Amino acid sequence: MRKLTSVAMLCALSVPGFAQADCGEVSITEMNWASNTVVTSVAKFIMEQGYGCDVTVVPSDTIPAVTSVAENGEPDIVTELWLNSAGEAYLKLEEQGKVERLGKVLDPGGVEGWWIPTYLAEKHPELTTIEGVMANPELVDNRFNNCPSGWGCRVVSDNLIRALDLEASGIEVFNHGSGETLASSMASAVQDEEPWFGYYWGPTVPLGKFDMTRVELGDYKPDVHTRNQTQDVDNPGVSEFPAAPVLTSVTTDFKEREPEVAEMLSKLTFKTDTMSALLAWMDKSNASAEEAAVYFLNNNSDEWSSWLNDDARERLASVLE
């Protein structure tokens, strides 16, 4: 499929900006889910072409990224940090003055939970509650599709599984090895109208593409959910997932070293609907994250122009011409 991008723009994504600013070396995470790869690609392009930074992308996941910041003070920037999944380890870093949240990278935020296909919910409405699922495990193919290791949602879901004694009800927990296999398991089931039960979050291509129904886990209990964010906690409980703040976080050293870039990152916010539409374009066009970043920058100057200072805006506009 023809990509709606230019060769020059894609080359610019892989080449640091000219020596046009005082920004030095910067490290930024890239998590292994679609929206985050787009956020990272957009931020990288702006930092390099608008601010002259030399950007290193660090492949990571939520928990390893927080651990790395705690132990090494790097990477400088953690993009798309899902606060509900980051756990107490991240909050301790804030208390210690090592990191600072700059702002919401998704507005109003994300949604996460345990889901079944809507066609399954319509056929078996009892499956819309966790009690109904556990009473009828065969209707969900006796399987729960869990997050990969290293994801914050894996910790929370593991604790929920223990608190519910889910496996005792006859449901096997399948721990996916990657976000790609988790997504493909949903896609394969929905396309064949087969049962599927598992964790997912949005904005994502699958939740935008497929009609899914959230399984009710009960009331949201802040203290229980906070406890469940700690791996292998002694007293896990059952709580619904709350609305999810999704942030950009930086080390305090980076904010002091590169205040203008930090200011830009504090304004770098995607409307959740905009991100969903961008991911849908990315999927339909079979595009890479870099190509999606180019597509966004070429078609949404009214959004990103307010993120940058005057000099950076002028530099970036000249690249996009």
Predicted segment positions?
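Ligand-binding cleft/hinge of the Venus flytrap
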Residues: 43-52, 137-172
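C-terminal lobe and pocket-closing loops
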Residues: 206-269
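A conserved helix-loop-strand patch within extracytoplasmic ligand-binding domains
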Residues: 99-150
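Gram-negative bacterial Sec-dependent N-terminal signal peptides
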Residues: 1-20
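Short, well-ordered beta-strand elements
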Residues: 22-35, 53-58, 141-145, 265
